[in-house]
């Protein structure tokens, strides 16, 4: 990297945009284009706010700042590490979260549902919420902000992920009503029921996982891939959900491109597939009554 003429924030953003395009980087871990990615990395690495006035972009950098920035941009380009991991932080629902390679980078369209407080689907204020397959804890913690009286459980199989989730609970000072549980699916929650269960489980099928850009392979495979059709965990979740939902509870699950596999596996079930104004697909909703109605069907499909 020749830096002799790279002096200002604007210089580095412009340079990064050009190099990102030349390297064919993938954008999808918080931004969707080279300009936003470059601005995010340059400002974030120098601990400057995204909303900084454009007049500040012509400020010259100190030598140590230039060296640090050059190294971060090099790693983004050469190693294809997502920006959130390089900065140690990602935003979800307008809330900052600590992240590293033990957890997926937050990016679920479920954020839009949380911001709308799950209207018009949720019949009443939830007293207990479960974020199943929580990872960084972003979905559950965002729900805790949306429903200020709710108790929120963050559950995950990965001890590593739960360490990150606990960092975020402490970061947001929510320890009095948000806590973590380790277990495979519902295994760590015997006898517990919830008014709202939200999950972004691993759902990428084997074919899609093999074809994913290099950036995704920095994320934990446990959080992405889940069997040939991506539904190994979702099958179990559906078979057990009725035992963990309150009388009028809701189950909301993101399955992404595996939506086609869900529809093929359960043609008898009237899933509500939610729509999003800001992009995203493959998120279904079932009521507790539907989960009870189809409990035996769901159990019968545990084996493909």
Swiss-Prot record:
Domain of life assignment: Bacteria
Catalytic reaction(s) noted: L-glutaminyl-[ribosomal protein uL3] + S-adenosyl-L-methionine = N(5)-methyl-L-glutaminyl-[ribosomal protein uL3] + S-adenosyl-L-homocysteine + H(+)
Biological process per Gene Ontology, one example term: methylation
Gene3D superfamilies listed in its UniProt record: DNA helicase RuvA subunit, C-terminal domain, Vaccinia Virus protein VP39
Entry's EC annotation: 2.1.1.298
UniProt KW S-adenosyl-L-methionine keyword: yes
Keywords: Methyltransferase, S-adenosyl-L-methionine, Transferase
Signal peptide (from-to): none
GO CC, one annotated term: cytosol
Entries under InterPro entries matching the protein: DNA_methylase_N6_adenine_CS, HemK-like, Ribosome_uL3_MTase, SAM-dependent_MTases_sf, Small_mtfrase_dom
Pfam family, one: MTS
CDD domains in UniProt: AdoMet_MTases (cd02440)
Molecular function GO terms recorded: nucleic acid binding; protein-glutamine N-methyltransferase activity
Similarity comment text for this entry: Belongs to the protein N5-glutamine methyltransferase family. PrmB subfamily.
HAMAP family the UniProt entry points to: L3_methyltr_PrmB
Function, as annotated: Methylates large ribosomal subunit protein uL3 on a specific glutamine residue.
Name of the molecule in the record: Ribosomal protein uL3 glutamine methyltransferase
Designated gene of the protein: prmB
């Amino acid at each position: 990297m020749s830096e002799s003429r790279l002096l200002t924030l604007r210089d580095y953003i412009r340079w990064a945009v050009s190099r990102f395009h030349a390297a064919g980087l993938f954008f999808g871990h918080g931004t969707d284009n080279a300009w936003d990615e470059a601005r995010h990395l340059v400002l974030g690495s120098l601990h400057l706010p995204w909303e900084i006035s454009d007049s500040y972009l012509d400020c010259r950098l100190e030598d140590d700042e230039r060296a640090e920035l050059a190294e971060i941009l090099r790693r983004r380009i050469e190693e294809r590490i997502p920006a959130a991991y390089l900065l140690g932080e990602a935003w979800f629902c307008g809330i900052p979260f600590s992240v590293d390679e033990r957890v997926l980078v937050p990016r679920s369209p479920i954020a839009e549902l949380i911001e709308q407080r799950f209207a018009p689907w949720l019949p009443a204020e939830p007293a207990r919420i479960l974020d199943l397959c929580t990872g960084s804890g972003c979905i559950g913690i965002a729900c805790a902000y949306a429903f200020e009286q709710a108790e929120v459980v963050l559950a995950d199989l990965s001890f590593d992920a739960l360490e990150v989730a606990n960092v975020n609970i402490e970061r947001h000072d929510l320890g009095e009503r948000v806590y973590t549980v380790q277990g495979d699916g519902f295994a760590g929650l015997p006898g517990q029921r919830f008014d709202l269960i939200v999950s972004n489980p691993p759902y990428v099928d084997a074919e899609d996982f093999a074809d994913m850009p290099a950036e995704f392979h920095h994320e934990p495979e446990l959080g992405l891939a889940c069997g040939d059709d991506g539904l190994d965990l979702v099958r179990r979740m559906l078979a057990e959900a009725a035992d963990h939902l309150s009388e009028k509870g809701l189950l909301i699950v993101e399955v992404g491109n595996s939506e086609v596999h869900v529809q093929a596996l359960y043609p008898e079930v009237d899933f509500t597939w939610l729509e999003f104004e800001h992009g995203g697909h493959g998120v279904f909703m079932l009521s507790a009554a539907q989960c009870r109605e189809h409990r035996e069907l769901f159990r019968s499909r545990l084996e493909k």
